[in-house]
Amino acid sequence: MKLTNMLVVCSSLALVPAALAQRWEVGGAIGGGFYTSQDVSAPGGSASAKIQSNISGSVWVGNNGRGRWGGEIRFDVQKGDFLLNQGGTQASFGANSYDAHYDVLWHFTDTEARVRPFVGAGAGIKVYRGTGTEQAYQPLYNFALLTKDQDLTPMVSLAAGIKFAVSSHLQFRVEVHDYLTPFPKKVIVPAQGASVGGWLQDIVPAAALAYTF
């Protein structure tokens, strides 16, 4: 028993240098989200469905080892109305979205470098949420209905950016994220006889500040 306890203590002490070697950061970013669109096909033709470009915010907690690998847990929120367009006719509905994901980062320079370009990839979940007021009549209802509901979807996250060390504990960075999800059919609901598929891309350029320790 004494030998077992000693091994546990020694193993725990052996992990201390590895934990101290990690450099942690907490940060926040603000930017804008720009969505791609998908066509809703119906017997009478097709309409373009998308989410309006709007402001986006993000917070994260990350860690970086002494090498070039790192990772971060992020939470993002974004405004953006649901939109349907065909010719000169448009339907819109108030909406927003939020997501949570984990990204693995690879840096092109070591931890001590003052400038660190990086790329990242990860996965998580995204919730699209209608916040508008449903009306008895909606333009382009024969293609899709924009609803006050929510749709939880899986999400793939891709990223690239550059980190700049302003001081020993302050970091500025510019970054671009590409968030991909299946089309949210529970909030942009195809009409009977209509169909829509594929994925939406949400491209989010942003500027950020982080505190490192």
Q: Where do the language-model regions lie?
A:
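Gram-negative (and chloroplast) outer-membrane scaffold detector with strong preference
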Residues: W60-P139, P154, D202-F213
